[in-house]
Every structure is written in C-alpha cells, then in structure tokens.
Amino acid sequence: MKTVTVKDLVIGTGAPKIIVSLMAKDIARVKSEALAYREADFDILEWRVDHFADLSNVESVMAAAKILRETMPEKPLLFTFRSAKEGGEQAISTEAYIALNRAAIDSGLVDMIDLELFTGDDQVKEAVACAHAHDVKVVMSNHDFHKTPEAEEIIARLRKMQSFNADIPKIALMPQSTSDVLTLLAATLEMQEQYADRPIITMSMAKTGVISRLAGEVFGSAATFGAVKKASAPGQISVNDLRTVLTILHQA
C-alpha cells in the first residue's frame, strides 16, 4: 500500500497521525488559537472553515489561512468546510462549496482539502483533478451522525472514494450500540486488507466509539482526531492522552 507524504509527514505507516481541528469564528480568534495550538503535540492542523463567520468574503478566508500557514509553517494544513448535512456549522450551495475549495487550492496556502463524497460525482472528480494539479492532497469524507450502516456499505463508500482518486478516504459514523463499533472496525480491517491501496481514516464516534480512535494501527486507520481545546466531534480525547495511548500501542 502506498503512503501519502505531506511536508515531512508520512501518512499510512507507523502509529496513526493526530489531526486537530481549529474552529475559530473570526481572524482575531484564528490568530490567538493558532498561537495556542502551536504548543500542542499533533501532526496535522485541520481548519474547520464552516465555523468562520465571514465566509462570503474569500479574501478574508484566505487571510485567515495565511495566518495559520505563517504561525505553523511546518504543520500540514487541512482545509475543511464541513457541510451542515454532515454535521457542520453552516449550509452553503454546492457551487459555493466547490468555489471555496477551489480558492483554497489556488491560494497555495493549504496542503490538503477535505471533499465530501456526496457533494456530487462530477463536482468531486473535477475538484480532485484541480487539487492534484496544484499538488494539494485530498481527504475525501463521509459522516453520519445518526447511524452506522452495514460493513458492506462502509466498504463501498471507501472504495468509491478511492475510485475517485482521493488520496485518503475517510469515514466517521455514529454507533447506536457497541456492535456498531465492531462493524466499523471490521469494515476498516476488510478494506485495509482487501481493497485499500492508500491510507484510510475511519472512526466510530461518541464515547461508545472511543476505542476506534485509539486502535487505528491495529485495524487499519492511518489517522485520528484529538482535541487541543474543544472537541470538534463527540468522542475526541485530548492530544496528550491520545499520543500516549497511540505510542503504547505502537511500541507494544
């Protein structure tokens, strides 16, 4: 299986990489939070742009991206607008969503973008091609905050992302029971062993699913999300605790 290298970070080998989400509402808070995050132990900075209030002003969005790039130049920067239908803060049109991601790609300020699988097949394929033309990696994602589908469906979605040339397919699902967590882990393992030719990221959310955020190296998930301050999704634990557990499992 091939790995994905962003800056000096190799994703898809060794212990799962830690992603943290920054969710500031304006440029001043982007700056102050970036300074606070700089001291934390993580691998990838995800900027959750759906929390940014001045979204209609692309110049303002890119000014904030520039602050993040300058504050943490060594950290890979993942640009993510999470749609309302997949658990994000704001709803925008598909056209606006694609335009925002295109602006991020063209800016040269971001290393990776998050593209939601169910945005529309043609739009997703075009955005992936655009990203790759600018040497920007694509995390293609799907989130369900209500349920966990059958393992076959989980695998089908991850394989579809792979077929759309995503660099890293990602899926996050809400368990209604502990057996749902096992379904997610079994699907991850089957995907990793039988179909994946690149790193994947999977997680089961909430307290019930916490084990999935810790056991990625065992089952085949290449990265996990931790919290520096406020968690961006239910079930995230602090980056310090996360690094400790990931290291213990890696060295065992």
Swiss-Prot record:
Name this protein carries in UniProt: 3-dehydroquinate dehydratase
SUBUNIT field: Homodimer.
Xref: Gene3D superfamilies: Aldolase class I
Keyword annotations: Amino-acid biosynthesis, Aromatic amino acid biosynthesis, Lyase, Schiff base
NCBIfam families: aroD
Residues the entry annotates as binding 3-dehydroquinate: 21, 46-48, 82, 213, 232, 236
Catalytic activity, as annotated: 3-dehydroquinate = 3-dehydroshikimate + H2O
Superkingdom of this protein's organism: Bacteria
Gene behind this protein: aroD
Pfam families: DHquinase_I
